[in-house]
From Swiss-Prot:
It comes from the Eukaryota. GO terms for cellular component: Golgi apparatus; membrane. The keyword Protein biosynthesis does not apply. A zinc finger (B box-type) spans 1-43. A zinc finger (RING-type) spans 53-101. The keyword ATP-binding does not apply. It comes from Drosophila pseudoobscura pseudoobscura. The modification Phosphoserine is found at S217. The chain crosses the membrane at residues 258-278. Residues 168-233 are annotated as: Disordered. Keywords: Membrane, Metal-binding, Phosphoprotein, Transmembrane, Transmembrane helix, Zinc, Zinc-finger. SMART domains: RING. This is Zinc finger protein-like 1 homolog.
Amino acid sequence: MGLCKCPKRLVTNQFCFEHRVNVCEHCMVQSHPKCIVQSYLQWLRDSDYISNCNLCGTSLEQGECVRLVCYHVFHWDCLNARQAALPANTAPRGHQCPGCSVEIFPNTNLVSPVADALKNYLAQVNWGRNGLGLALLSEDQSSSLKAIKSKASVSQAAVSNMTKVHHIHSGGERERGKPNGGDASTPHSVLLMDAFNPPSSGDFNASSRRPLLPRQSPIGGTDRDDNKYQRRTPAALLSRWTRRFYSPSSRPPWRRTWFLVLSGILAFVMFIYLLAWMGRSGSNDGLDESWNNPNPQPNHYE
């Protein structure tokens, strides 16, 4: 079990073999759509992986990929062609993962970002809609979906190419403007938004509540995951304990105030007790012993 490093901070046992980090299902869909993800125990047994599609043998980076509920990744075109070649009367349980023979169609009561993304792909083809219990698409509708999908992929590729050209061109202008005593244009940033997947109101609300910079505790440090098993020296433990007094904390302020007050009272009582003990030990000198002796011995002088 591990903690995902995304803002959701979910506990997960899935591990990305390529980036070597714990990932939750939200990160699988958003940040690791083409990565090899399996359990952390599987990675401990064998960390070797091949980032190729098991159906065609080519790299997963060369096409659109889909992740099944068993977390295996395939090219969508390869998986669609394989499952479409099955008979039309194939039961939903007959559509299985080529790698582990797990049913492709997720359960209806499964709440999972990976399952939701898979359902979006399955809803585009008739064999997928048949397994999901949806109405079948006509030939015109399926052809229009394919045309829209191809246009979307072409436009996204063109936007990415234009972005690269723009960065190269702007970088060249800045390099030419430096010898003349300053930059030719002021630095700026370009915000590209997907025209086919506009952000919803929920995304705006979520982004408005997200802090600009993640708050890092100065006590644990930035390399908390790297040295969490390192042996702490007494100096490091003392420094960590003293830094808690001025570090920002999520606890109520009255707890810290009461802790300081009780610590001061305890220190004052210990100081008074120490002074009293030292006073009693200093009063037991030889003069007091002679006056309190019941059988004094007189001194004889010759």
